[in-house]
Amino acid sequence: MLYKEFDAATTPIEGRMLLEASAGTGKTYSLMRVLLRLLVEKGIELDRILVVTFTNAATDELSSRLRSNLTELIEQIRLNKSGSFNDLLDSWGEKKYSQDIILEKLQTALNKIDDAAIFTIHGFCQRILQDFVFSSKGNYDFEIGDDSNAKDKALSTFLRTNLPKAYPGYPT
């Protein structure tokens, strides 16, 4: 199947967006461009944008990259210099966006960077459960734990319990 090349600076950004591609193809780069465009072109506040990914490492990378992109873009505009955001600045210039308004939106986002909703799927679900526990009429005396070692513990217990029975003389 042939796919059209994705251009983060010009692709329409209305509605939902799914960005799917192989490793090393620039997904994070493109996602950051789309986020910056949502902030500037649509005036969406950073805490109103949801980014969901698979791993904790990816959430850390996205958060770090967003902070550095905002900082770098603000500096590029303030110093009126050429840089890695020329594509966006050219597009915004063609659309007659005011640099003062762009700077204000970007600085506001940078000031609220800790409110960015960048989660793993599990982290997002946990957040929803915590935020809406009362309206869900669910049990709010619950704890969300990490069961990542549960399988290893169960296997270890099973082997420790059953191997000596199956193989008398098996060292325990």
Predicted features along the sequence, with ranges:
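Conserved RecA-like ASCE P-loop NTPase motor core of nucleic-acid helicases/translocases
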Residues: 45-58
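Walker A/P-loop NTP-binding motif
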Residues: 30-44, 67
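Short helix-terminating capping/connector loops at secondary-structure junctions
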Residues: 43-46, 111-112
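Conserved pre-motif I regulatory segment
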Residues: 1-22, 33
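Conserved ATP-dependent motor core of P-loop NTPases, especially the RecA-like helicase ATPase domain
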Residues: 2, 12-16, 53, 70, ...
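Residues immediately flanking
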Residues: 23, 34, 54-56, 121
